[in-house]
Amino acid sequence: MTSEKQLILYNDADHNYDYVRACLIKYCKHDFLQAEQCIVIAHNRGNCAIKQGDIMDMIPIQEELEKKGLLTKLISMN
């Protein structure tokens, strides 16, 4: 069993682009363009993989995003 996970961001109607972009930049360490692309994908498809890595690295990021009210889920990469 692998500990590699993807952190998925789900689209919602409660948060605007600026708010989500700021969260992705702060907690996922995205640059402006990467955050913007993730937001557009999540908006158009309903979700977007915003980060991947070891579960122990992903859990704190997920917790911070959820504290900010964003909908996320960790999924296995296989």
PLM segments and residue spans:
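Terminal domain-initiation and capping elements
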Residues: 1-78
